[in-house]
């Protein structure tokens, strides 16, 4: 692959860029990539072929043009430009992007925590209401056949009021989002992580699940529902709800029983 760069753009001293991948069938993908990590080290941007599964699949059948659209001296500026471009072309029939931005991932782009966030983001693809209902129906049917009442199962499925996140910091500077990944790195059991001499901090945080999200006059049951309607990433909706500069974005949390 070979990147095309306009003569007016200078890579030197830039840390990130936005790009477009164009295919012969007119389809295209807009993305963001770093020239350098937060530690100032060069990345593999010259060999980078996108994290999009759709792009990777199309590359098996087509040759693509890789175009650097703009260069930036900060990750945040590049992400904002990426979001602006995707919004501009989101209704274009040839665009391959399925969501607008992954805004919160710019904080620690090379940490283990960031990698885990990306992994979780791909695992938690937004499902349609029809798909969710089918999953619920199958669960209810399964437990019904195992001597559990439908009311009990429905209550069990919808009973989650909070989710737990873990942050484990090591002396080496590495951070992990689970005891399993930390144990693998430290070559010990999960039970031994808490008392391991290389562990300097363990934080366990309970994040309440929204009771509702209100944006302008519209009320949604979750960040995901709001994101689907506004064509934003759920994490971006959450960030806006917590930002004092956006008073029209409101979130109300359920009370967590202790």
Curated annotation (Swiss-Prot):
InterPro entries, per this entry?
Answer: GIY-YIG_endonuc, Intron_nuc_1_rpt, NUMOD3
Mind listing the UniProt keywords for this protein, alphabetically? Endonuclease, Hydrolase, Intron homing, Nuclease
Some GO term, biological process aspect, for this entry: which one?
A: intron homing
The domain of life is: Viruses
Which residues are in the GIY-YIG domain?
14-96
Give its E.C. classification number: 3.1.-.-
Q: Does the keyword Transferase apply?
A: no
Q: Which SMART domains match?
A: GIYc, IENR1, IENR2
Q: Name one GO molecular function term.
A: DNA binding
What does the record give as the function of this protein? Answer: This endonuclease is specific to the nrdD gene splice junction and is involved in intron homing.
This chain belongs to the protein called: Intron-associated endonuclease 2
Say which species the protein is native to. Answer: Enterobacteria phage T4 (Bacteriophage T4)
- Gene it is expressed from: ITEVIIR
């Amino acid at each position: 692959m070979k990147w095309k760069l306009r003569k007016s753009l200078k890579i030197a001293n830039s840390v990130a860029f936005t790009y477009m991948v164009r295919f012969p069938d007119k389809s295209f993908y807009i993305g963001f990539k770093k020239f350098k990590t937060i530690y100032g080290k060069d990345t593999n941007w010259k060999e980078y072929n996108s994290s999009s599964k759709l792009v990777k699949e199309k590359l098996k059948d087509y040759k693509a043009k890789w175009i650097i659209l703009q260069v930036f001296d900060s990750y945040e500026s590049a992400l904002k430009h990426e979001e602006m471009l995707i919004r501009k072309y989101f209704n274009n029939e040839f665009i391959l992007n399925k969501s607008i931005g992954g805004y919160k991932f710019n904080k620690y782009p090379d940490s283990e925590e960031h990698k885990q966030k990306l992994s979780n983001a791909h695992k938690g693809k937004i499902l349609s209401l029809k798909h969710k209902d089918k999953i619920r129906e199958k669960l209810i049917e399964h437990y019904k056949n195992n001597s559990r009442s439908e009311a009990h199962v429905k209550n069990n499925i919808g009973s989650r009021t909070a989710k737990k996140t873990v942050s484990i910091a090591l002396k080496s500077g590495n951070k992990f989002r689970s005891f399993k990944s930390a144990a693998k790195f430290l070559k010990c059991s999960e039970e031994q992580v808490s008392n391991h001499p290389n562990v300097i901090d363990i934080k366990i945080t309970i994040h309440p699940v929204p009771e509702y999200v209100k944006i302008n006059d519209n009320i949604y049951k979750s960040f995901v529902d709001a994101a689907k309607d506004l064509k934003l990433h759920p994490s971006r909706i959450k960030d806006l709800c917590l930002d004092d500069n956006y008073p029209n974005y409101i979130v109300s949390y359920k009370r967590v029983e202790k």
